[in-house]
């Protein structure tokens, strides 16, 4: 068998992994953030402000991302995994349900469904892009429908290596089979899909701001949506299920009164992270 491998025919005992001399003296990271003076100034301003968390910089960052992508609502959150967890919960995914997603992704895309007692099913990917194959998704949906299986609640498409998935075709399939479309857009901030920003599609999309992503907040993520009901549910899930807005309280008992109306998590992003994200 012929091969074009650069190590074919060489003495593999000379490879560093087998005791040979390394070609580098220092570790080569798989990604690295870019931090400039304005980023440092933004973080310093946040550190010396009145709010380190739950302050105005959260909304500022959310608005900036929502405006860039072209959606109504954004919910900044602790990390990309938390973003997926929150999105799945808001979509009503729960015990016994199933999602269809891509095997070419970070584990969190699947794990977030397992957190809720659901099960991931895997569609194939296109060999030229690594993106989830709409034809494979359709095959899974059709096969499960023929079996009378109504457990599939969502298709979770993964934007991969800066490439948005085939949003239009996947949305058509989601509508046809009455499932939700959610976009894991961790790789597509700044990308374009038919003249629109990556991550605009589906009932929700999620992003990550880990240092290997397009912009970073250290750790951090965001959920984007045009649905006000989903937005409200995401806000509650992010912060212990707490409701502070006067018009949504069951009763009102002074300026510091709040209600824990549902079960939620502490998945909040802090103002220091948000300041860095807005600067980036």
Mark where each language-model region is.
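Conserved coil-to-alpha-helix start sites within the AMP-binding
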Residues: 105-110
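Hydrophobic/aromatic ligand-binding patch that stacks against planar heteroaromatic rings
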Residues: 111-113, 173, 272
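Phosphate-binding glycine-rich loop
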Residues: 51-98, 112-114, 122-124, 146-147, ...
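N-terminal "arm"/small-domain region of PLP-dependent enzymes with the aminotransferase-like
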Residues: 1-52, 56, 259-261
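Active-site phosphate-binding strand-loop segment of PLP-dependent enzymes
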Residues: 128-217, 222-230
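Structured binding elements
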Residues: 117
